[in-house]
Protein backbone atom coordinates (compact mmCIF):
# COMPACT_ATOMS: atom_id res chain seq x y z
CA UNK A 1 0.00 0.00 0.00
CA UNK A 2 2.79 2.44 0.84
CA UNK A 3 4.55 1.83 -2.45
CA UNK A 4 1.26 2.37 -4.34
CA UNK A 5 0.71 5.66 -2.52
CA UNK A 6 4.28 6.75 -3.21
CA UNK A 7 3.89 5.90 -6.90
CA UNK A 8 0.60 7.81 -6.97
CA UNK A 9 2.19 10.87 -5.37
CA UNK A 10 5.14 10.85 -7.77
CA UNK A 11 2.78 10.24 -10.69
CA UNK A 12 0.71 13.22 -9.61
CA UNK A 13 3.84 15.39 -9.70
CA UNK A 14 4.63 14.05 -13.18
CA UNK A 15 1.19 15.16 -14.33
CA UNK A 16 1.61 18.59 -12.71
CA UNK A 17 5.03 18.99 -14.33
CA UNK A 18 3.61 18.15 -17.78
CA UNK A 19 0.77 20.63 -17.26
CA UNK A 20 3.15 23.37 -16.13
CA UNK A 21 5.44 22.68 -19.09
CA UNK A 22 2.45 22.88 -21.45
CA UNK A 23 1.46 26.25 -19.99
CA UNK A 24 5.04 27.53 -20.13
CA UNK A 25 5.65 26.32 -23.69
CA UNK A 26 2.36 27.83 -24.90
CA UNK A 27 3.03 26.09 -28.21
CA UNK A 28 0.23 25.59 -30.72
CA UNK A 29 -0.46 21.91 -31.37
CA UNK A 30 1.53 20.62 -28.39
CA UNK A 31 -1.29 19.80 -25.98
CA UNK A 32 -1.60 16.14 -27.04
CA UNK A 33 2.15 15.70 -26.57
CA UNK A 34 1.98 17.03 -23.01
CA UNK A 35 -1.06 14.86 -22.26
CA UNK A 36 0.78 11.77 -23.48
CA UNK A 37 4.02 12.74 -21.72
CA UNK A 38 2.42 13.34 -18.34
CA UNK A 39 0.59 10.01 -18.48
CA UNK A 40 3.70 8.20 -19.74
CA UNK A 41 5.93 9.57 -16.98
CA UNK A 42 3.33 8.87 -14.28
CA UNK A 43 2.64 5.31 -15.48
CA UNK A 44 6.38 4.52 -15.45
CA UNK A 45 6.21 4.97 -11.67
CA UNK A 46 4.14 1.80 -11.37
CA UNK A 47 0.48 0.93 -10.76
CA UNK A 48 0.00 3.86 -8.38
CA UNK A 49 1.33 6.32 -10.94
CA UNK A 50 -0.85 4.86 -13.69
CA UNK A 51 -3.87 5.09 -11.38
CA UNK A 52 -3.13 8.73 -10.53
CA UNK A 53 -2.67 9.58 -14.21
CA UNK A 54 -6.04 8.03 -15.11
CA UNK A 55 -7.88 9.74 -12.25
CA UNK A 56 -6.36 13.13 -13.06
CA UNK A 57 -6.88 12.76 -16.82
CA UNK A 58 -10.50 11.64 -16.45
CA UNK A 59 -11.27 14.43 -13.97
CA UNK A 60 -9.74 17.03 -16.26
CA UNK A 61 -11.65 15.83 -19.30
CA UNK A 62 -14.94 15.56 -17.40
CA UNK A 63 -14.49 19.08 -16.05
CA UNK A 64 -13.65 20.37 -19.53
CA UNK A 65 -16.75 18.71 -20.99
CA UNK A 66 -18.84 20.33 -18.26
CA UNK A 67 -17.42 23.81 -18.87
CA UNK A 68 -17.65 23.39 -22.66
CA UNK A 69 -21.43 23.26 -22.28
CA UNK A 70 -21.30 26.86 -21.13
CA UNK A 71 -18.58 27.96 -23.56
CA UNK A 72 -20.00 26.30 -26.67
CA UNK A 73 -23.67 26.07 -25.72
CA UNK A 74 -23.61 22.29 -25.67
CA UNK A 75 -22.77 22.17 -29.37
CA UNK A 76 -20.35 19.27 -28.88
CA UNK A 77 -17.49 21.26 -30.42
CA UNK A 78 -15.27 20.32 -27.49
CA UNK A 79 -16.20 16.62 -27.58
CA UNK A 80 -13.89 15.75 -30.46
CA UNK A 81 -10.93 17.46 -28.79
CA UNK A 82 -11.74 15.71 -25.51
CA UNK A 83 -11.72 12.31 -27.25
CA UNK A 84 -8.37 13.16 -28.85
CA UNK A 85 -6.99 14.21 -25.45
CA UNK A 86 -8.16 10.93 -23.90
CA UNK A 87 -6.54 8.96 -26.74
CA UNK A 88 -3.24 10.78 -26.07
CA UNK A 89 -3.64 10.11 -22.34
CA UNK A 90 -4.15 6.39 -22.95
CA UNK A 91 -1.27 6.30 -25.45
CA UNK A 92 1.13 7.60 -22.82
CA UNK A 93 -0.30 5.53 -19.97
CA UNK A 94 0.10 2.36 -22.03
CA UNK A 95 3.85 3.00 -22.32
CA UNK A 96 3.89 4.20 -25.92
CA UNK A 97 6.34 6.98 -26.83
CA UNK A 98 4.75 10.40 -26.22
CA UNK A 99 6.98 11.87 -28.93
CA UNK A 100 4.44 10.45 -31.40
CA UNK A 101 2.45 13.62 -30.59
CA UNK A 102 5.41 16.02 -30.39
CA UNK A 103 4.93 18.91 -32.83
CA UNK A 104 7.79 19.98 -35.05
CA UNK A 105 9.64 22.94 -33.57
CA UNK A 106 8.72 22.39 -29.91
CA UNK A 107 11.84 23.43 -27.96
CA UNK A 108 14.09 20.55 -26.87
CA UNK A 109 13.74 21.49 -23.19
CA UNK A 110 10.31 19.81 -23.30
From Swiss-Prot:
**In what ranges is there compositional bias, type Basic and acidic residues?**
93-110
Which organs or tissues contain this protein? Expressed by the liver; secreted in plasma.
Question: Which superkingdom heads the taxonomic lineage of this protein's source?
Answer: Eukaryota
Its GO biological process annotations read:
acute-phase response
A GO cellular component annotated for this chain's UniProt record is: high-density lipoprotein particle
The disulfide bonds in this chain are none
Q: Do the record's keywords include NAD?
A: no
Q: Which InterPro entries match?
A: Serum_amyloid_A, Synovial_Prolif_Regulator
Q: Does the keyword Iron apply?
A: no
Which Gene3D superfamilies has this protein been placed in? Serum amyloid A protein
Protein name, UniProt field: Serum amyloid A protein
Amino acid sequence: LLSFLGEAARGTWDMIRAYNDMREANYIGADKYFHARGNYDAAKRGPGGAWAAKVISDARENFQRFTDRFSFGGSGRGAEDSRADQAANEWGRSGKDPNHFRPHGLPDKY
